């Protein structure tokens, strides 16, 4: 890990004179070290920074995450990071619970570069995290988000209505499943169950307003059917969320093509 810089980050102003990505380790409020990458906007200095929260088993260096970052960087600066238990980050995954602290650290780091707007976008598990983060950090100036987009997010916990989700629950909840997660999927999963159970995405959504909220979901998502995004949009209240139902789209960042990513970037950048 000699190529990373660990320790407190400094406040700085980013311009087109600093085009190279910056990789570092962030420390969360509960002491977990999180790998993160900052990429300036390729079009020059930008007011907005987009913080990207990947899905379960993803990481900062996964091709789908890098593809999204490249598209987003055409409109804004971008921060990507690996959730705890993923990639080069420390700790073990809590599958959406304490990951809110990882996102908060990434948002604070993005703000340290002087951007006037910092927005979040999350995919699948990351989608649930950005919703909970927006609900929980609205009053915390340095860690709050100015807009939030959730892609392929679940509305409720413990969903087992599809075969992929039943397999995922086996990976997370069984000792042999966690071995498969670690050595087969590269994800280190915490063995303890949630206690207490965190606020669910659908319970979080009503607490997000007046922060702009976008919910995106594919009509061919094999994990979460369309009642999930519709439930989230309804919970937000009339006029409090945009809902994009994408024809032919599957699940999360792996299914997001460059056209959709470009539309997301425009929405997040306020264009």
Task: Give each language-model segment a name.
Residues 29-41:
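A short loop-to-beta-strand scaffold at the N-terminal edge of the catalytic core in hydrolase folds
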Residues 69-90:
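Conserved alpha/beta-hydrolase
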Residues 94-113:
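Alpha/beta-hydrolase active-site loop
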């Amino acid at each position: 890990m000699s190529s990373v810089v660990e320790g407190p980050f400094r406040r700085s102003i980013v311009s087109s004179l600093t085009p190279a990505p910056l990789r570092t380790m962030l420390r969360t409020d509960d002491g977990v070290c999180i790998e993160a990458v900052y990429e300036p906007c390729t079009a020059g200095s930008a007011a907005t920074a987009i913080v990207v929260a990947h899905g379960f088993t993803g990481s900062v260096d996964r091709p789908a995450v890098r593809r999204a970052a490249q598209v987003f960087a055409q409109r804004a600066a971008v921060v990507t990071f690996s959730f705890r238990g993923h990639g080069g980050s420390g700790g073990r995954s809590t599958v959406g619970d304490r990951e809110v602290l990882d996102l908060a650290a990434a948002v604070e780091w993005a703000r340290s570069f002087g951007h006037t707007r910092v927005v979040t976008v999350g995919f699948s598990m990351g989608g649930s995290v950005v919703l909970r983060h927006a609900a929980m950090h609205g009053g915390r100036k340095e860690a709050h988000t100015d807009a939030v987009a959730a892609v392929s997010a679940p509305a409720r916990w413990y969903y087992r209505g599809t075969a992929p989700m039943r397999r995922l629950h086996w990976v997370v909840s069984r000792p042999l499943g966690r071995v498969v997660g670690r050595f087969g999927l590269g994800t280190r999963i915490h063995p303890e169950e949630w206690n207490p159970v965190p606020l669910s995405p659908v319970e979080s959504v009503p607490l997000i307003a007046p922060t702009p909220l976008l919910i995106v979901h594919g009509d061919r998502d094999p994990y979460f059917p369309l009642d999930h995004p519709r439930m989230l949009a309804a919970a937000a209240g009339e006029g409090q969320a945009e809902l994009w139902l994408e024809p032919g789209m599957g699940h999360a960042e792996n299914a997001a093509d460059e056209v959709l990513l470009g539309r997301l970037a425009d929405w997040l950048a306020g264009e």
